[in-house]
């Protein structure tokens, strides 16, 4: 099942939306609860009378301390403004002297009603006793306070949800930072932690891919260095034998002096043969390292029947000239393969060189073509001749063939059983 891929932006937007919905629901719930509590406990008639009586006492004290008369309307307005949420009405001698709601045009005209008489309280002013009515929205301040607390609580819930939601991403980012420091310390075998499918996971995967590629590069370099060291050791050993023989034959020929003779000719012929063997070794070594320095072979799609037929025909003609018998079985298929023609020719040249050096001319050389829908193979087998020529123990020719086949996306296999030697050249069929 394909994973849903959320970017960090989408994740954050979704998180904020969820946090907003949850905090909004919590805010409305808290507001309903606090409103019910305030309405139940602070909106009763008893609480209203208690608060009114308390404000009457507070106002009476304010009047006494400032020796106010019923005409000090400015001072009354300042007190009302300071206390907030209340209405103040003052009567004296049955007439309205001050009202925090009405305009001054009504002062002295509005009379004290029976309702006002029943709900007013006596307060002593500097100019005599007056009747004072204080009405207040006493619970309003609690509604405002509850609203602020509810909003604060919902905001805290919103922040907690958002912080809790991004905590995992922050922890993962910290983990990536720590693992990068581990890699910087040289611990290249340490694997990066890959979690999820967002940008952070993509960064971690990119670093992990880079780590693996770097390790593969180091491994390839180490293998190449080990192969080069081994090859140098083997080549020094293989070149020592013909070189020693060459020197000995030249010394023998030198001792013969200027006189021509059968023994001198034999020494010269042997020296010439060893020189050719050394040249062959050096040529193979040069070709091998030349392949190593090249990057990629330029491949082209060719018809098997045309290209392989031409190459095989040329090689068989050479073998016939050298008095070898060749048996061919199988047919060349009507398929196509990707090859580099130059390197393919070098592959066949190396195969031919090995046959000329080591194949027994008294025995047949067998060449077999094998193919199916996916592959095309060339099987070559021969009997190894018994001679005083020591085969190249380093297998440099085989290594060159294997490397060129690999560069052409093919494969090379060889095996020796007793006196029989077998090789397989494998190519993958392609479409034109």
Swiss-Prot record:
EC class of the enzyme, as a word: transferase
Annotated Gene3D superfamilies: 1.10.287.130, 6.10.340.10, Histidine kinase-like ATPase, C-terminal domain
PROSITE patterns, A to Z: HAMP
Principal location: membrane
Molecular function via GO: ATP binding; phosphorelay sensor kinase activity
Catalysed transformations (reactions): ATP + protein L-histidine = ADP + protein N-phospho-L-histidine
Protein keywords: ATP-binding, Cell membrane, Kinase, Membrane, Nucleotide-binding, Phosphoprotein, Transferase, Transmembrane, Transmembrane helix, Two-component regulatory system
Pfam family, any one: HAMP
Membrane topology designation: Multi-pass membrane protein
Modified residues (Phosphohistidine): 237
Residues in the Cytoplasmic compartment per record: 1-12, 167-432
SUPFAM superfamilies assigned to the protein according to its UniProt record, in alphabetical order: ATPase domain of HSP90 chaperone/DNA topoisomerase II/histidine kinase, Homodimeric domain of signal transducing histidine kinase
GO cellular component annotations of the record: plasma membrane
Keyword Electron transport: no
Ranges in the topological domain labelled Extracellular: 34-145
EC number(s) reported in the record: 2.7.13.3
Functional summary from the UniProt entry: Member of the two-component regulatory system YrkQ/YrkP. Probably activates YrkP by phosphorylation.
Protein's recorded name: Sensor histidine kinase YrkQ
Organism of derivation: Bacillus subtilis (strain 168)
Lineage: Bacteria, Bacillati, Bacillota, Bacilli, Bacillales
């Amino acid at each position: 099942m394909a994973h849903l891929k959320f970017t960090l932006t989408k994740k954050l937007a979704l998180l904020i939306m969820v946090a907003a919905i949850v905090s909004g629901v919590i805010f409305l719930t808290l507001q309903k609860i606090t409103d019910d509590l305030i309405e139940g406990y602070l909106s009763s008639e008893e609480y209203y009378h208690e608060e009114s009586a308390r404000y009457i006492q507070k106002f009476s004290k304010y009047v006494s301390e400032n020796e106010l008369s019923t005409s000090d309307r400015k001072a009354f307005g300042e007190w009302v403004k300071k206390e907030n949420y209340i209405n103040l009405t003052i009567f004296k001698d049955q007439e309205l002297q001050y009202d925090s709601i009405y305009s001054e045009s009504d002062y002295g005209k509005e009379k004290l009603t029976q309702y006002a008489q029943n709900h007013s309280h006596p307060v002593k002013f500097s100019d005599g006793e007056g009747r004072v009515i204080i009405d207040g929205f006493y619970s309003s301040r609690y509604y405002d306070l509850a609203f602020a607390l509810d909003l604060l609580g919902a905001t805290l819930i919103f922040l907690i949800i958002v912080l809790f939601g991004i905590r995992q991403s922050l922890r993962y980012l910290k983990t990536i930072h720590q693992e990068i420091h581990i890699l910087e310390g040289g611990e290249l075998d340490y694997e990066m932690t890959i979690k999820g499918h967002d940008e952070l996971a993509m960064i971690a995967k990119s670093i992990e891919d880079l780590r693996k590629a770097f390790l593969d590069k180091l491994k390839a370099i180490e293998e190449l260095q080990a192969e080069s060291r081994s090859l140098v050791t083997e080549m020094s050993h293989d070149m020592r034998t013909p070189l020693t023989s060459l020197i000995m034959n030249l010394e023998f020929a030198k001792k013969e002096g200027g006189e021509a003779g059968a023994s001198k000719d034999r020494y010269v012929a042997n020296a010439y043969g060893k020189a050719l063997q050394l040249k062959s070794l050096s040529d193979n070594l040069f070709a091998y390292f030349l392949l190593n320095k090249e990057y990629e072979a330029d491949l082209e799609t060719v018809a098997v029947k045309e290209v392989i037929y031409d190459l095989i025909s040329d090689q068989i003609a050479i073998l016939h000239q050298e008095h070898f018998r060749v048996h061919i079985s199988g047919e060349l298929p009507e398929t196509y393969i990707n090859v580099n023609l130059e390197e393919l020719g070098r592959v066949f040249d190396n195969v031919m060189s090995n046959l000329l050096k080591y194949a027994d001319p008294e025995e047949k050389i067998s060449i077999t073509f094998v193919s199916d829908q996916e592959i095309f193979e060339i099987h070559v087998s021969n009997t190894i001749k018994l001679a005083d020529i020591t085969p190249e123990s380093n297998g440099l020719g085989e290594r060159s063939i294997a490397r060129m086949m690999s560069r052409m996306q093919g494969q090379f296999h060889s095996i020796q059983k007793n006196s029989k030697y077998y090789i397989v050249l494998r190519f993958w069929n392609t479409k034109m």
